[in-house]
Regions:
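Active-site-proximal loop/hinge segments within enzyme catalytic domains
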Residues: 1-87
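An anion-binding loop in the catalytic cleft
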Residues: 51-143
Protein backbone atom coordinates (compact mmCIF):
# COMPACT_ATOMS: atom_id res chain seq x y z
CA UNK A 1 0.00 0.00 0.00
CA UNK A 2 2.80 2.41 0.91
CA UNK A 3 4.52 1.80 -2.44
CA UNK A 4 1.28 2.30 -4.40
CA UNK A 5 0.50 5.52 -2.56
CA UNK A 6 4.06 6.73 -3.07
CA UNK A 7 3.80 6.21 -6.84
CA UNK A 8 0.39 7.88 -6.91
CA UNK A 9 1.72 10.86 -4.94
CA UNK A 10 4.65 11.22 -7.33
CA UNK A 11 2.31 11.49 -10.32
CA UNK A 12 0.04 13.93 -8.50
CA UNK A 13 2.90 16.20 -7.40
CA UNK A 14 4.22 16.44 -10.97
CA UNK A 15 0.71 17.26 -12.22
CA UNK A 16 0.23 19.96 -9.56
CA UNK A 17 3.64 21.55 -10.25
CA UNK A 18 2.80 21.75 -13.95
CA UNK A 19 -0.51 23.47 -13.13
CA UNK A 20 1.25 25.94 -10.79
CA UNK A 21 3.74 26.83 -13.54
CA UNK A 22 0.85 27.35 -15.99
CA UNK A 23 -1.04 29.52 -13.42
CA UNK A 24 -4.01 27.12 -13.54
CA UNK A 25 -4.32 26.80 -9.76
CA UNK A 26 -6.08 29.33 -7.56
CA UNK A 27 -4.59 29.55 -4.08
CA UNK A 28 -6.97 30.03 -1.15
CA UNK A 29 -5.89 31.16 2.31
CA UNK A 30 -6.59 28.75 5.13
CA UNK A 31 -9.35 29.67 7.56
CA UNK A 32 -7.44 29.51 10.85
CA UNK A 33 -10.68 29.36 12.88
CA UNK A 34 -11.62 26.06 11.22
CA UNK A 35 -8.12 24.59 11.15
CA UNK A 36 -7.06 21.95 13.64
CA UNK A 37 -3.61 21.02 14.86
CA UNK A 38 -2.27 17.48 14.85
CA UNK A 39 0.64 16.73 17.12
CA UNK A 40 3.72 15.08 15.67
CA UNK A 41 3.49 11.30 15.92
CA UNK A 42 6.13 10.05 18.33
CA UNK A 43 7.43 6.50 18.81
CA UNK A 44 5.66 6.27 22.18
CA UNK A 45 2.30 6.79 20.42
CA UNK A 46 2.58 3.26 19.03
CA UNK A 47 2.82 1.59 22.45
CA UNK A 48 0.00 -0.92 22.88
CA UNK A 49 -2.11 -0.91 26.03
CA UNK A 50 -3.75 -4.34 26.15
CA UNK A 51 -6.58 -2.96 28.33
CA UNK A 52 -7.87 -0.99 25.35
CA UNK A 53 -10.41 -2.53 22.98
CA UNK A 54 -9.15 -4.86 20.26
CA UNK A 55 -10.70 -2.52 17.67
CA UNK A 56 -8.76 0.46 19.00
CA UNK A 57 -5.50 -1.50 19.12
CA UNK A 58 -6.03 -2.78 15.57
CA UNK A 59 -6.75 0.77 14.37
CA UNK A 60 -3.53 1.96 16.03
CA UNK A 61 -1.52 -0.83 14.36
CA UNK A 62 -2.98 0.04 10.95
CA UNK A 63 -2.66 3.81 11.36
CA UNK A 64 0.94 3.76 12.55
CA UNK A 65 2.23 1.10 10.14
CA UNK A 66 5.04 1.02 9.13
CA UNK A 67 6.49 3.64 11.47
CA UNK A 68 6.43 3.92 14.39
CA UNK A 69 4.06 0.94 14.27
CA UNK A 70 2.01 -0.65 17.04
CA UNK A 71 4.40 -2.24 19.53
CA UNK A 72 4.81 -3.74 22.99
CA UNK A 73 7.72 -4.66 25.25
CA UNK A 74 8.26 -8.19 26.56
CA UNK A 75 11.37 -9.19 28.53
CA UNK A 76 13.00 -5.85 27.64
CA UNK A 77 12.58 -6.43 23.89
CA UNK A 78 10.34 -4.46 21.55
CA UNK A 79 7.89 -6.37 19.34
CA UNK A 80 6.14 -4.57 16.48
CA UNK A 81 2.78 -5.92 15.31
CA UNK A 82 2.54 -5.48 11.55
CA UNK A 83 -0.87 -7.07 10.93
CA UNK A 84 -3.70 -8.29 13.15
CA UNK A 85 -7.39 -9.23 13.06
CA UNK A 86 -10.10 -9.00 15.68
CA UNK A 87 -10.91 -12.30 17.41
CA UNK A 88 -14.01 -13.15 19.42
CA UNK A 89 -12.03 -15.07 22.07
CA UNK A 90 -11.99 -13.63 25.57
CA UNK A 91 -9.18 -13.54 28.08
CA UNK A 92 -7.32 -11.24 30.40
CA UNK A 93 -5.82 -8.15 28.74
CA UNK A 94 -2.31 -9.01 27.56
CA UNK A 95 -2.72 -12.78 27.97
CA UNK A 96 -1.66 -14.99 25.05
CA UNK A 97 -4.75 -17.18 24.68
CA UNK A 98 -3.61 -19.90 22.27
CA UNK A 99 -1.01 -21.16 19.80
CA UNK A 100 -2.42 -18.86 17.08
CA UNK A 101 -1.00 -15.83 18.92
CA UNK A 102 -4.37 -14.49 20.00
CA UNK A 103 -3.94 -11.90 22.74
CA UNK A 104 -6.65 -10.79 25.15
CA UNK A 105 -7.64 -7.13 25.08
CA UNK A 106 -10.03 -4.92 27.01
CA UNK A 107 -13.17 -6.26 25.33
CA UNK A 108 -12.28 -9.27 23.17
CA UNK A 109 -8.93 -10.18 21.58
CA UNK A 110 -6.52 -9.63 18.74
CA UNK A 111 -5.14 -12.34 16.47
CA UNK A 112 -1.60 -11.40 15.47
CA UNK A 113 -0.95 -12.26 11.83
CA UNK A 114 2.49 -10.70 11.35
CA UNK A 115 4.99 -9.61 13.99
CA UNK A 116 8.57 -8.37 14.10
CA UNK A 117 10.95 -8.77 17.00
CA UNK A 118 13.39 -5.90 17.45
CA UNK A 119 16.34 -6.35 15.07
CA UNK A 120 14.76 -9.36 13.33
CA UNK A 121 12.81 -9.96 10.12
CA UNK A 122 8.99 -9.87 10.11
CA UNK A 123 7.36 -13.28 10.64
CA UNK A 124 3.87 -14.71 10.53
CA UNK A 125 2.54 -15.82 13.91
CA UNK A 126 3.28 -19.55 13.40
CA UNK A 127 6.95 -18.92 12.48
CA UNK A 128 7.28 -16.46 15.32
CA UNK A 129 5.94 -18.82 17.99
CA UNK A 130 8.35 -21.62 17.01
CA UNK A 131 11.36 -19.69 18.27
CA UNK A 132 9.76 -17.35 20.78
CA UNK A 133 9.51 -17.30 24.56
CA UNK A 134 5.98 -15.97 24.11
CA UNK A 135 3.67 -18.99 24.46
CA UNK A 136 0.00 -19.56 25.33
CA UNK A 137 -0.54 -18.40 28.91
CA UNK A 138 2.18 -15.73 28.72
CA UNK A 139 1.14 -12.36 30.14
CA UNK A 140 2.22 -9.35 28.10
CA UNK A 141 2.00 -6.70 30.77
CA UNK A 142 1.86 -3.01 29.97
CA UNK A 143 5.55 -2.37 30.70
Amino acid sequence: LLDRLSNLAEETVIEIIDKIIENKIKFVDQNHHEATYANKIEKIDGKINWSESAELIQAKINALNPNPGGWFIFNNERYKILDADISSKYGQPGEVLDENLIIGCGNNSLKILKIQRQGKKPQNSKEFLLGSKIKPGTKLLNE
